[in-house]
Regions:
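N-terminal glycine-rich FAD/FM-binding segment characteristic of electron-transfer flavoproteins
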Residues: 1-181
Length: 181
């Protein structure tokens, strides 16, 4: 499963000169670039394991459907849009709780167990890097952040993750199920 977010295209940003706030009107939206990396990683794992499927989930306004359709065109198998006006302005904790609840619902209703949940390291419109780890916590899953390489050992039910950090890299073994950013 891949969590994505539709974000404003930062190459087109304009600020209101009086308030210094982002002018969103007419601003094109894109799939968060870091989430596109997560989708690429999920599709690479799918290619390695026969019978694997990639489901893409996003929380946002109805127009976020366009982001899901883009992911489907790139090879994702299923997509789910979590949308309600009540979610507008949600902080990272509310967002994480809502997405985790949707993941539980998808697992229950589709009788699927997600072994790996992929998230981008952060969204370019917030840069908090909190939603992925908070989803993992809400679901009680192991997590590995700042991953730059991932290999999966299904027989041993673990993943080997190369993580980037300020002093270089480290390689960690993490049990499945796993959330990786």
């Amino acid at each position: 499963l891949v969590c994505i977010k539709q974000v404003p295209d930062t190459s087109e940003i304009k600020l209101d000169p009086e308030t210094n706030n982002l002018i969103r009107t007419g601003l094109p939206s894109i799939v968060n670039p870091y989430d596109m990396h997560a989708l690429e990683a999920a599709l690479a794992v799918k290619d390695q394991y026969e019978g694997s499927r990639v489901t893409v989930v996003t929380m946002g306004p109805p127009q976020a459907e366009a982001a899901l359709r883009e992911c489907l065109s790139l090879g994702a198998d299923d997509a789910a849009l979590i949308t309600d006006r009540a979610f507008g302005g949600a902080d990272t904790l509310a967002t994480s709780y809502t997405i985790a609840s949707a993941i539980r619902h998808i697992q229950r209703t589709m009788n699927r167990e997600f072994q790996i949940i992929f998230c981008g390291k952060q969204a370019i419109d917030g840069d908090t890097a909190q939603v992925g780890p908070q989803i993992a916590e809400e679901l009680g899953m192991a997590q590995a952040t700042y991953a730059c390489e991932l290999s999966v050992d299904q027989a041993a039910q673990k993943a080997i993750v190369k993580r980037e950090h300020e002093n270089g890299y480290e390689i960690v073994e993490v049990p499945l199920p796993l959330l990786v950013t």
